[in-house]
Curated annotation (Swiss-Prot):
It is found in: Cytoplasm; Nucleus. Keywords: Cytoplasm, DNA damage, DNA repair, Hereditary spastic paraplegia, Neurodegeneration, Nucleus, Protein transport, Transport. It comes from Homo sapiens. It comes from the Eukaryota. As part of AP-5, a probable fifth adaptor protein complex it may be involved in endosomal transport. According to PubMed:20613862 it is a putative helicase required for efficient homologous recombination DNA double-strand break repair. This is AP-5 complex subunit zeta-1. Coiled coil: none annotated. Probably part of the adaptor protein complex 5 (AP-5) a tetramer composed of AP5B1, AP5M1, AP5S1 and AP5Z1. Interacts with ZFYVE26 and SPG11. GO terms for cellular component: AP-5 adaptor complex; AP-type membrane coat adaptor complex; cytoplasm; late endosome; lysosome; nuclear speck; nucleoplasm; nucleus. Its main location: cytoplasm. It is linked to Spastic paraplegia 48, autosomal recessive: A form of spastic paraplegia, a neurodegenerative disorder characterized by a slow, gradual, progressive weakness and spasticity of the lower limbs. Rate of progression and the severity of symptoms are quite variable. Initial symptoms may include difficulty with balance, weakness and stiffness in the legs, muscle spasms, and dragging the toes when walking. In some forms of the disorder, bladder symptoms (such as incontinence) may appear, or the weakness and stiffness may spread to other parts of the body.
Length: 807
């Protein structure tokens, strides 16, 4: 969330029109052409970067301005801040045909890194990625003493390796592996020299001290990213940079492709998961560069795990410890996949690490890579995978649902490891109520992730309970908010809407009378039962205005679409019936968040039709329930889309064409129910409490009644009389208060068309209840048999008959 000032600046940047931007660019061009690039230039470039980065679409800059930005980026004496801004602006414009940066003419390593970042943002248009990679390698080979340091180039190299793994040749990969070994293992243990204090500084004050551990002890082992000091030397910075790119290098550096196992000199290990002999120290023999790098990477990760046991003196170091643990476990996982001998050597320390961090809420992010490691190597590692699953899915979502970063990483972990769940997929599926806590609290950023995950979560056994949970998701958001508000004060409370005051909701949350409903909503696993949460909807109505609840409500329609797309792949006939009944039953039992019901009803109406298409006999099998649903007009206008879909489905599928069990008695019952419903709809007058009924409801009701009459011809006189009344009613002035002029015209036209059809019952049945053959594409392509031809023929016959009648 941005502050009010930041939001205001972003809004202003987005509102700037192209003409204003053009004038501003002209001013920047004058500043960049001046000899002195002062504070005005810096301020203007900052504003330009904000303008072009604040919008989703690309802003077009004048070619003169782009050329000057590129020229400024290449100036040797240009201030670093200006060059960083020029590179950032050019990256925002990428990919662009107007960029023409020259990589070969850049000598300074800092400038090389900035130019490379722009070229890589361009994409691999003219093999820029390969050119950048080769340029970085030449700089690394030159061992240039001048310039800030080679450390500016390592992030570029890491990006090149990921974007184009085949860029490096074997000898180049070997060279960089050797350099990485040196940087990782042999960085200095002395701090960097301080800046000169001038004439009055003493030589003793300028002597560098040793680096320390995070707890203040003097470091006695090799330097790592967790070593502390006031100033770092260049080789220490290179150590940090090397570790940051280590995992990407191990995965992508081989010429044979990403993640390929290196089997050189390891034929004796083929077919073996663990090799005690290979796990012994390799110090006694000279290893090839790639294997030597793996050995050093393993030692580095082991040292990081040991350093993470130390009690950090500063909070920043404590956070760094956890971040380094995550990366160390990920690197160890790569090493064990590439060389199984590392698995035997890693297990003891990783099991100890898992036992230490599983009870520490502050280290919860470390559990995800640890769980991935144990699940990946579970059989060989002799780890109880079920225990790992249970702890992961039971405790973490309950305790950490309010952490946005962890929520994203947790759902990403579930998506990335679906292939590892295999026999434990039921554990994941049963844990969906806990996973939905992440979704309820972080719905905007997690919606797309859950849309991708839902197909794996949906199961025939829990589909109904999951649909209830999705419909109650905004209610869950409100309850999670209350849970945090009622918890004891914590040192780091998550953010909520402080402007919202809901004392009655807090009292209800603590009331033992409602504890059962609240506990059901907060359940950690699928219970196999469903609870009617309508009482909670009323109790929590004051929370409906909460911004987080509103955001969650906006995400539910998208999630419902994904759910139905998945459930229809696994649903049998019985489940389809239950889903249809659930749609009808929950249509008037939704949390009263603003605009929520309208969005949900739109999805439910389309999905009800999809279920009927999937199983046309649904209408006959659920005849009694559909009649009950249609028996009440209460809330019809608020559920107009769903009512329209139900009525249309009755007219389409209540026929012996789709189900031989359909009887004339059923058709008559539905006709009477729909006739009564149409009468009540047309008699209701809109008011503040009862909104205007859409004309689509009336036209679909008339069409369905006509369809039913064509299938039970005893009903034709009643249907004709009803349609005549509707046509007359549409002409009356009273209709103007109920429907707009366009709506009344639509009703009048539809009534006239249907009356015309009913004058020839056999043709009406042909048109309104076509056989399977008539529905085939031939009837819509062949001019001699097309349905429009049949309709035109009927119209002419009826007109001729009307002309012969005495006036």
């Amino acid at each position: 969330m941005f502050s009010a000032g930041a939001e205001s600046l972003l809004h202003q940047a987005r509102e700037i029109q192209d003409e204003e931007l053009k004038k501003f660019c002209s001013r920047i061009c004058k500043l960049l052409q001046a000899e002195d690039l002062g504070p005005d230039t810096l301020d203007s470039l900052q504003r330009l970067f904000l303008i072009i980065s604040a919008t989703k679409y690309s802003r077009r800059l004048e070619k003169t301005c782009v050329d000057l930005l590129q020229a400024t980026l290449g100036l040797p004496a240009c201030p670093e801040q200006l060059q960083v801004l020029c590179a950032a602006i050019l990256r925002e414009m990428s990919p662009s045909d107007s960029l023409s940066l020259a990589w070969d003419h850049t000598q300074n390593s800092r400038q090389l890194s900035l130019v490379a970042s722009v070229l890589l943002a361009q994409g691999d248009r003219n093999e820029e990625v390969r050119a950048v990679g080769q340029g970085v390698l030449r700089a690394l080979e030159s061992r240039q003493p001048e310039g800030p340091s080679l450390r500016h180039l390592l992030p570029v190299m890491a990006k090149v390796v990921v974007l184009s793994p085949g860029t490096l040749q074997e000898d180049q990969a070997t060279l960089l592996s050797k350099r990485l070994v040196d940087w990782l293992r042999y960085a200095s243990l002395q701090q960097g020299l301080p800046h000169s204090g001038g004439f009055f500084s003493t030589p003793r004050a300028r002597q560098p001290g040793p680096v320390t551990e995070v707890d203040g002890a003097v470091a006695t082992d090799f330097f790592t990213v967790l070593s502390s000091g006031h100033r770092f030397t260049d080789d220490q910075w290179l150590n940090v940079q090397a570790f940051s790119m280590l995992r990407a290098w191990l995965l992508h550096s081989g010429p044979e492709g990403p993640g390929t196992l290196d089997t050189d000199d390891r034929s004796e290990q083929e077919g073996s998961t663990l090799s005690v002999i290979s796990a012994t120290s390799s110090a006694g023999r000279l290893l090839p560069p790639r294997e030597r790098l793996r050995e050093v990477a393993f030692e580095y990760c082991q040292r990081l795990i040991e350093q993470s046991n130390r009690r950090a003196l500063r909070k920043g170091d404590s956070d760094l410890q956890k971040a380094c643990l995550v990366e160390a476990v990920l690197v160890l996982d790569v090493l064990c996949r590439q060389d199984p001998s590392f698995l035997y050597r890693s297990l003891s320390c990783l099991k100890a690490l898992h036992g230490r961090v599983r009870g520490d809420p502050a280290s919860v992010r470390v559990l995800l890579p640890l769980a991935h490691f144990f699940l990946s190597h579970g059989e060989a590692a002799a780890v109880d995978s079920e225990a790992v699953y249970q702890h992961l899915f039971t405790r973490i979502p309950v305790e950490q649902f309010h952490s946005p970063m962890l929520a994203f990483e947790f759902i990403q972990f579930c998506r990335d490891n679906l292939h590892l769940f295999s026999g434990h997929l039921s554990t994941l599926r049963l844990s969906f109520p806990n996973l939905f806590k992440f979704l309820a609290w972080n719905s905007p950023p997690l919606t797309s992730e859950f849309v991708a995950l839902l197909p794996a979560l949906v199961d025939a056994g829990t589909a109904l309970e999951m649909l209830h949970a999705l419909l109650d998701l905004p209610c869950l958001t409100a309850v999670l908010d209350l849970q945090l508000r009622s918890a004891p004060a914590a040192s780091e409370r998550p953010l909520w809407d402080t402007s919202l005051r809901a004392p009655s909701c807090l009292e209800a949350f603590r009331d033992p009378q409602f504890q059962g409903l609240f506990q059901y909503l907060l359940r950690p696993k699928a219970s196999g039962a469903t609870e009617r949460l309508a009482p909670l909807h009323q109790l929590l109505q004051p929370m409906a205005g909460c911004a987080r609840v509103a955001q969650c409500a906006q995400a539910v329609p998208t999630l419902l679409q994904a759910f139905f797309s998945a459930v229809t792949q696994v649903a049998d006939g019985s489940l389809i019936n239950q889903l249809a009944l659930l749609l009808l039953g929950r249509s008037d039992s939704l949390y009263p968040a603003p605009g929520y019901a309208a969005g949900v009803h739109s999805v439910l109406s389309s999905q009800f039709l999809a279920l009927c298409t999937l199983k046309p006999s649904l209408v006959v099998e659920l005849a009694r329930d559909l009649l009950e649903f249609l028996g009440s007009v209460n809330g019809l206008c608020s559920r107009a889309s769903l009512v329209t879909s139900v009525v249309w489905a009755i007219g389409e599928y209540l026929s012996v064409t789709y189900d031989r069990r359909c009887t004339v008695e059923q058709i008559n019952k539905f006709f009477e129910a729909l006739e009564a419903l149409l009468f009540e709809v047309t008699q209701c007058r809109p008011s503040a409490a009862l909104p205007r009924c859409p004309p689509q409801v009336v036209t679909v009701l008339m069409t369905t009644l006509t369809k039913l009459a064509s299938r039970s011809q005893d009903l034709i006189p009643r249907a004709s009389l009803l349609l005549s009344k509707m046509r007359t009613l549409a002409h009356s002035p009273a209709t103007s208060s109920t429907h707009s002029e366009e709506g009344a015209e639509a009703i009048r036209t539809r009534a006239t068309e249907l009356l015309t059809l009913l004058k020839m019952p056999s043709v009406a049945q042909f048109v309104l209840t076509p056989s399977t053959e008539v529905c085939s594409p031939r009837y819509h392509r062949d001019a001699n048999t097309a349905l429009p031809l049949a309709l035109r023929t009927v119209s002419r016959l009826v007109e001729r008959e009307a002309g012969l009648m005495p006036g």
